Amino acid sequence: MKVIPLASESLGVRSLATYVKTKDVGILIDPGVALAPDRYGLKPNDIEFEKLREMRNKINDYAKKSNVITISHYHYDHYTPFFDDIYLESKDYAKELYKDKILLIKHPTEFINKSQMNRAKKFLESVKDIAKKIEFADNKTFKFGKTEIKFSPPFPHGRDDKLGYVLITTVKEGKFKFMHTSDTQGIIFDDIRDYIIKEKPNLILMGGPPTYLMHRYGKKNLEKTNENLKYIVENTGAELIIDHHLLRDKKFREKINVDFKTVAEFLGEKNLLLEAYRKEIKQGKDINELFG
């Protein structure tokens, strides 16, 4: 199995898009990318928009290699909608992305909040005549040759269900398992921790806790996440990649008490935290000095 994370905060955008290739099938997980409309009272800079376009093109290139596309939930950094927005630049990419693909997606009306339900409805109206097949994936397993794609029951997006629910995706080929936890925002809940341990993945790509919003996330939730991360590593031995919300925090490394790599580090690249350092970039500081 080959696992290639495509876009994330450590690569300069909001995303957790990932490509997985097995002998049987090419899988594109959560093919979305976006920019924060506002951070520190600042709009995205030209460098961020360049990265957005670069990552959109990369995701669409890997879509051409994919038979299956999965969507864990309906936030714009996890799927590509059929409308345009300055912080998404998605309209021209969506039709090409989903054309003739098998879509394994979060249920559009069950365990979902109102905002995402509306997005899912519009998405399905646009994609139904383009995709090869559409399956609602919640708590189901799909087989492609000897490859299994397993989806969890819906789990809360973060510390409660106000932001809806997400699916954890696990791809198994032979004895190797790759798990994409999507926006569980760290591991606050024991049932998510126990689900991960039961699956015994070898490699986990996790959307980390939003420590840049500690006033909302809370110290106790971060302590619980660190406790559960330690327990997961001890009981699975999995290699851990943590990115997404966590990498919106300049001091991300000191917030997590287990060994992990960012997506950029996993790929052998430098962390490029464009959103977290938007203020410094606005002040004219050199990117090579910030991230060199």
From Swiss-Prot:
Record-linked InterPro entries: RibonucZ/Hydroxyglut_hydro (IPR036866), UPF0173_UPF0282_UlaG_hydrolase (IPR050114), UPF0282_hydrls (IPR014426)
Listed Gene3D superfamilies: Ribonuclease Z/Hydroxyacylglutathione hydrolase-like
Annotated signal sequence range: none
Superkingdom field: Archaea
Gene Ontology MF term list: hydrolase activity
Sequence similarity: Belongs to the UPF0282 family.
Protein name: UPF0282 protein MJ1629
Annotated organism of origin: Methanocaldococcus jannaschii (strain ATCC 43067 / DSM 2661 / JAL-1 / JCM 10045 / NBRC 100440) (Methanococcus jannaschii)
